[in-house]
Amino acid sequence: MIIGITGGIASGKSTVVKVIRKAGYQVIDADQVVHDLQEKGGRLYEALREAFGNQILKADGELDRTKLSEMLFSNPDNMATSSAIQNQIIKEELAAKRDHLAQSQAIFFMDIPLLMELGYQDWFDAIWLVYVDAQTQLQRLMARNRLDKGKARQRIASQLPIEEKKPYASLVIDNSGDIAALIKQVQSALLLLANPR
């Protein structure tokens, strides 16, 4: 059984993943996969450098992720170019990791922030959506990424609204409350997985 984890930016997916890992389950983290592919010499690093030139690199040759993010979120054409380049490479890498893990794990998870936006729904037996109301999401993103309201709204707007993700979810984990309530919901869901009714 493969379970997809998704949610809006700053919804609390990382905390959910920590609880799942603590319970002994394997989680493939799409953001980490992307990070690895963007390392100097990686497939995405080379593809992005070819598309946007050396202006997206730091002095030491590493990818300047902050500069790249600013370029993408401020220009829809850049975002479209980047998505076209990256999505296929990422999909291939995630599929390879999924197939490898499926050989040894009966149940595992994949944390994919843009799961619905990029059409990964068919990969999963279940989808867990980490939900947070719009105001809380905005405040958390501004605090976490030190963004002003305008930039935070821009990032949230680049994803499918969380309400539109709900119909795809087999389980909605509500993170509008405190961290203890969030952890309790995840632990209950994991208990049901281990002991299905």
Curated annotation (Swiss-Prot):
This is Dephospho-CoA kinase. HAMAP family: Dephospho_CoA_kinase. It is found in: Cytoplasm. Catalyzes the phosphorylation of the 3'-hydroxyl group of dephosphocoenzyme A to form coenzyme A. Residues 2-197 form the DPCK domain. PANTHER family: BIFUNCTIONAL COENZYME A SYNTHASE-RELATED, DEPHOSPHO-COA KINASE-RELATED. Gene3D superfamilies: P-loop containing nucleotide triphosphate hydrolases. Its main location: cytoplasm. It comes from Streptococcus pyogenes serotype M1. Pathway: Cofactor biosynthesis; coenzyme A biosynthesis; CoA from (R)-pantothenate: step 5/5. It is an enzyme of class 2 (transferase). GO terms for biological process: coenzyme A biosynthetic process. One of its GO terms (cellular component) is cytoplasm. Keywords: ATP-binding, Coenzyme A biosynthesis, Cytoplasm, Kinase, Nucleotide-binding, Transferase. Belongs to the CoaE family. SUPFAM superfamilies: P-loop containing nucleoside triphosphate hydrolases (SSF52540). InterPro entries: Depp_CoAkinase, P-loop_NTPase.
